[in-house]
């Protein structure tokens, strides 16, 4: 009795250079969560830039008119209005939070299935969005008042005289609304990453 098995050798040229068509399946379960975490980090960096730009732009908003009298100098500055002061402080807090949240976003990339950092980010992002929206809404009301005035109160708009001041303030408000939109999108991404599937 022989334990020998004869296997015919295929010596054709076509069979020698081909590899088997069966590939190993390396599908990682939850791979989309890592992709969401990377997208979260990129958006978070964008939100830092826009929130910081809004705070810095409003904080440097001032204009002095070239004409003045012996007793008066006509000047407009962000610290003349408490609403703009609140805007600068609130946007600085939001941008500071966003910088401090970057390590948690990196942890979410390294450990995409961890729910603790995601839950913390979704709660604090909601607080930051609320503060950002409050500051932006208050500032847009003052910018509108500066541009159009209020005929009922007999207030005239000042943007005809202080054009640079109004332009910089409007730019800061637009940047803050962009930051609010990015924060809202970050909350949606965190909610998607917290799903069980």
Curated annotation (Swiss-Prot):
<feature type="transmembrane region" description="Helical">
    <location>
        <begin position="172"/>
        <end position="192"/>
    </location>
</feature>
<dbReference type="InterPro" id="IPR044173">
    <property type="entry name" value="CASPL"/>
</dbReference>
<dbReference type="GO" id="GO:0005886">
    <property type="term" value="C:plasma membrane"/>
</dbReference>
<dbReference type="Pfam" id="PF04535">
    <property type="entry name" value="CASP_dom"/>
</dbReference>
<keyword id="KW-1133">Transmembrane helix</keyword>
<keyword id="KW-0325">Glycoprotein</keyword>
<keyword id="KW-1003">Cell membrane</keyword>
<dbReference type="InterPro" id="IPR006702">
    <property type="entry name" value="CASP_dom"/>
</dbReference>
<feature type="transmembrane region" description="Helical">
    <location>
        <begin position="120"/>
        <end position="140"/>
    </location>
</feature>
<feature type="transmembrane region" description="Helical">
    <location>
        <begin position="36"/>
        <end position="56"/>
    </location>
</feature>
<keyword id="KW-0472">Membrane</keyword>
<keyword id="KW-0961">Cell wall biogenesis/degradation</keyword>
<feature type="topological domain" description="Extracellular">
    <location>
        <begin position="141"/>
        <end position="171"/>
    </location>
</feature>
<dbReference type="GO" id="GO:0042545">
    <property type="term" value="P:cell wall modification"/>
</dbReference>
<protein>
    <recommendedName>
        <fullName>Casparian strip membrane protein 3</fullName>
    </recommendedName>
</protein>
<keyword id="KW-0812">Transmembrane</keyword>
<feature type="topological domain" description="Cytoplasmic">
    <location>
        <begin position="1"/>
        <end position="35"/>
    </location>
</feature>
<feature type="transmembrane region" description="Helical">
    <location>
        <begin position="86"/>
        <end position="106"/>
    </location>
</feature>
<comment type="subunit">
    <text>Homodimer and heterodimers.</text>
</comment>
<dbReference type="GO" id="GO:0048226">
    <property type="term" value="C:Casparian strip"/>
</dbReference>
<feature type="glycosylation site" description="N-linked (GlcNAc...) asparagine">
    <location>
        <position position="150"/>
    </location>
</feature>
<dbReference type="InterPro" id="IPR006459">
    <property type="entry name" value="CASP/CASPL"/>
</dbReference>
<comment type="similarity">
    <text>Belongs to the Casparian strip membrane proteins (CASP) family.</text>
</comment>
<comment type="function">
    <text>Regulates membrane-cell wall junctions and localized cell wall deposition. Required for establishment of the Casparian strip membrane domain (CSD) and the subsequent formation of Casparian strips, a cell wall modification of the root endodermis that determines an apoplastic barrier between the intraorganismal apoplasm and the extraorganismal apoplasm and prevents lateral diffusion.</text>
</comment>
<feature type="topological domain" description="Cytoplasmic">
    <location>
        <begin position="193"/>
        <end position="197"/>
    </location>
</feature>
<feature type="topological domain" description="Extracellular">
    <location>
        <begin position="57"/>
        <end position="85"/>
    </location>
</feature>
<feature type="topological domain" description="Cytoplasmic">
    <location>
        <begin position="107"/>
        <end position="119"/>
    </location>
</feature>
<dbReference type="GO" id="GO:0007043">
    <property type="term" value="P:cell-cell junction assembly"/>
</dbReference>
């Amino acid at each position: 009795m022989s334990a020998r098995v004869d296997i015919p050798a295929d010596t054709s040229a076509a069979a020698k250079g081909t590899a088997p068509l069966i590939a190993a399946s390396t599908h990682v379960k939850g791979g989309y969560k890592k992709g969401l975490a990377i997208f979260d980090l990129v958006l978070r960096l964008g939100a830092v830039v826009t929130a910081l730009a809004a705070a810095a732009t409003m904080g440097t908003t001032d204009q002095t008119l070239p004409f003045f009298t012996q007793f008066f100098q006509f000047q407009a500055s962000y610290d003349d209005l408490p609403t703009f002061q609140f805007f600068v402080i609130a946007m600085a807090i939001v941008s500071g939070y966003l910088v401090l949240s970057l390590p948690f976003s990196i942890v979410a990339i390294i450990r995409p299935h961890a729910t603790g950092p995601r839950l913390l980010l979704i709660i604090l992002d909601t607080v930051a969005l609320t503060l950002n929206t409050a500051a932006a809404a208050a500032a847009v009301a003052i910018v509108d008042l500066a541009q159009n005035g209020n005929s009922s109160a007999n207030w005239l708009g000042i943007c005809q005289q202080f054009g640079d001041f109004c332009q910089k303030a409007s730019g800061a408000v637009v940047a803050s609304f962009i930051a609010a939109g990015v924060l809202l999108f970050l909350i949606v991404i965190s909610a998607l990453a917290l799903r069980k599937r």
